[in-house]
């Protein structure tokens, strides 16, 4: 069986890896790569059928446009646009829960949609308003422009050019939202699906001090591609992050840890291979600062509630708090776990992805 992308990443970075990185890699192989590989071998025939079925489910339903989101309870939706220039402004929608005001500022979650989606469809898939209302969070949903990408994918695979411009534009929009709405600026997290997940990780590494936590659902590992062809290979698990880019990221972190990280990914994802999740975990571990207190490895646990899909949860903790969490969803294709029915890239049978994310973000202090 070929090595995982995570293992390839460490092989590529071997010459520049520190002793700390090598120790963490051994932990990664022992606690994620090896048990997962053994599990995949035991379930090879079952997984092949599951991938086919999951892909059909992910592509069924409505992609976009969807009906504009409406608040069916307290709180309100607002919409607008931000930015100018050759890449065109970006539309956005923002949900503000009741009770959030200048004296009672709320944490904010930035949700980045995947290819082919828009803010309305992604709000519907994730049930953003209902979950945010219950949790008391502001939710900001930026929308990619079809002028910037014909499929409305965030350009995570162009890190030195258009992708960097988009990351800067998104960061400016986030800061504007913090100024214009009752947001606790030190409690901003970002989470995305697919291309949005890769862009969320990109934002977390470009602007580490601005995010309390970051998350990717079914996203590619960032800095693994510089064009669309390379992006396709990365999504298949055939490319890892560029060693020079990773070295630059380490320098940019200047001795800081990257923000706490949540990774959610289905093991039946035929569009973005699950190995991207292990590669992203390995990247985060490699970027731990020299001399930092080592992360503690928590034994993997399996969770299943009722008839929902089972998940395997892998945690690394900093002190008593989780720092990195990888959630493998059994039988999930390229779709939002626990999403609303009737939409593409949404699997109602999985555990609620947005609730899982908010639980993690709250646990790390976001």
Predicted segments with their positions:
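Charged catalytic carboxylate motif
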Residues: 165, 169, 276, 352, ...
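Conserved alpha/beta-hydrolase "acid-adjacent" motif
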Residues: 271-276, 337
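Alpha/beta-hydrolase-fold catalytic nucleophile elbow
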Residues: 191, 215-218, 264, 329-330
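Serine-hydrolase catalytic machinery in alpha/beta-hydrolase-like enzymes
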Residues: 2-16, 34, 88-90, 100, ...
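Active-site-adjacent mobile loop/cap segments within catalytic or ligand-binding domains
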Residues: 326-339
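Hydrophobic beta-strand anchors of alpha/beta hydrolase catalytic cores
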Residues: 109-111, 261, 326
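Short beta-strand/loop motif that positions the catalytic acidic residue
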Residues: 263-265, 269
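A domain-start/cap signature at the N-terminus of enzymes
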Residues: 1-108, 120-121, 191-195, 199, ...
């Amino acid at each position: 069986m070929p090595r995982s992308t995570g293992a390839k990443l460490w092989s590529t970075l071997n010459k520049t890896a520190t002793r700390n990185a090598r120790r963490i890699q051994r932990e990664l192989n022992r606690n994620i790569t090896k048990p997962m590989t053994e599990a995949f071998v035991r379930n090879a025939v079952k997984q092949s059928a599951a991938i086919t079925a999951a892909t059909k489910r992910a592509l069924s339903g409505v992609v976009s446009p969807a009906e504009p989101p409406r608040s069916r309870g307290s709180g309100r939706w607002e919409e607008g646009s931000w930015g100018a220039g050759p890449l065109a402004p970006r539309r956005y929608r923002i949900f503000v829960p009741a009770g959030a005001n200048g004296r009672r500022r709320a944490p904010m979650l930035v949700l980045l949609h995947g290819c082919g989606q828009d803010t309305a469809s992604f709000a519907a898939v994730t049930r953003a308003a209902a979950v945010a209302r219950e949790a008391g969070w502001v939710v900001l949903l930026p929308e990619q422009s079809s002028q910037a990408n014909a499929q409305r994918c965030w350009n995570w695979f162009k890190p030195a050019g258009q992708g960097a411009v988009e990351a800067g534009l998104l960061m400016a929009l986030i800061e504007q939202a913090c100024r214009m709405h009752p947001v606790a600026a030190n409690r901003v997290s970002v989470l995305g699906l697919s291309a949005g997940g890769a862009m969320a990780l990109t934002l977390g590494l470009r602007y580490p001090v601005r995010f309390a936590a970051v998350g990717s659902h079914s996203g590619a590992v960032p800095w693994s591609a510089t064009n669309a062809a390379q992006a396709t290979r990365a999504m298949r698990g055939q490319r890892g992050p560029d060693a020079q880019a990773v070295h630059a990221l380490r320098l940019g972190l200047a001795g800081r840890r990257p923000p706490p990280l949540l990774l959610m990914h289905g093991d039946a994802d035929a569009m973005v291979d699950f190995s991207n999740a292990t590669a992203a975990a390995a990247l985060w571990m490699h970027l731990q600062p020299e001399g930092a207190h080592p992360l503690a490895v928590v034994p993997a646990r399996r969770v299943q509630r009722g008839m929902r899909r089972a998940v395997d949860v892998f945690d690394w903790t900093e002190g008593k708090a989780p720092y990195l969490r990888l959630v493998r969803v059994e039988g999930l294709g390229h779709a939002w776990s626990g999403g609303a029915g009737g939409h593409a890239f949404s699997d109602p049978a999985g555990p609620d992805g947005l609730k899982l994310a908010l639980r993690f973000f709250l646990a790390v202090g976001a």
